[in-house]
Amino acid sequence: MKAVVLAVALVFLTGSQAWHVWQQDEPQSQWDKVKDFANVYVDAVKDSGRDYVSQFESSSLGQQLNLNLLENWDTLGSTVSQLQERLGPLTRDFWDNLEKETDWVRQEMNKDLEEVKQKVQPYLDEFQKKWKEDVELYRQKVAPLGAELQESARQKLQELQGRLSPVAEEFRDRMRTHVDSLRTQLAPHSEQMRESLAQRLAELKSNPTLNEYHTRAKTHLKTLGEKARPALEDLRHSLMPMLETLKTQVQSVIDKASETLTAQ
């Protein structure tokens, strides 16, 4: 029963046709990927559930109860498919329209990011160039000292370390200067990007189209509930005979077992 409830819930949430991922020629949106995954999962649940029902009916207890679960399971699957067909077009059309209406926001944000990237790139290139130059200069200064270290005796190690220390400090100071310079150069662009992003979010929040979609979403959910109610009622009616039969048969088995124990 848990598998049945999960299957119905997933169908209600996705409301899509059984479109498989490998049948798509064009790139899929995130919503399409979620719907495809849900459909594959629902199909797997239905198939595995039918296998369990078939195995139970084949068992000695299932044959004794004679519940006709497999037939009822197929009826349940048909009812679920009908529910999916009723809800699919309405839900798919709503989300597709919402994605189209908000596409301009993504385009504007990508445009802003590209503009900032073009402005910042020269500073990054200059920083990388200076970094490489200083690393090469440091390597040239250290190389002779390293050779001298190999040739000198242990007693000159401290003297050599003293000579290396100023070079390392000079390199560190130069790197700090470059980093501070880069931070100063990038600061206006970072602030500009934050302001641009805040502006885009404000535009998105105040956009009348999205406000309209908020209202339409409420209407859509209400309509969806009204359309789903008959299908769910049919599903409930399909399950009730099976549950009542199961309850009666199980009670009969319990009564017989009680009579047997009493007789002993």
UniProtKB/Swiss-Prot annotation:
The modification Methionine sulfoxide is found at M109, M193, M240, M242. Residues 67-264 are annotated as: 10 X approximate tandem repeats. Sequence repeats lie at residues 67-88, 89-110, 111-121, 122-143, 144-165, 166-187, 188-207, 208-229, 230-240, 241-264. It is found in: Secreted. Residues 1-18 form the signal peptide. Its main location: secreted. One of its GO terms (cellular component) is endocytic vesicle. The keyword Signal applies. Keywords: Cholesterol metabolism, Glycoprotein, HDL, Lipid metabolism, Lipid transport, Lipoprotein, Oxidation, Palmitate, Phosphoprotein, Repeat, Secreted, Signal, Steroid metabolism, Sterol metabolism, Transport. Major protein of plasma HDL, also found in chylomicrons. Glycosylated. GO terms for molecular function: amyloid-beta binding; apolipoprotein A-I receptor binding; chemorepellent activity; cholesterol binding; cholesterol transfer activity; enzyme binding; heat shock protein binding; high-density lipoprotein particle binding. It comes from the Eukaryota. Participates in the reverse transport of cholesterol from tissues to the liver for excretion by promoting cholesterol efflux from tissues and by acting as a cofactor for the lecithin cholesterol acyltransferase (LCAT). As part of the SPAP complex, activates spermatozoa motility. Homodimer. Interacts with APOA1BP and CLU. Component of a sperm activating protein complex (SPAP), consisting of APOA1, an immunoglobulin heavy chain, an immunoglobulin light chain and albumin. Interacts with NDRG1. Interacts with SCGB3A2. Interacts with NAXE and YJEFN3. Belongs to the apolipoprotein A1/A4/E family. PANTHER family: APOLIPOPROTEIN, APOLIPOPROTEIN A-I. This is Apolipoprotein A-I. The gene is Apoa1.
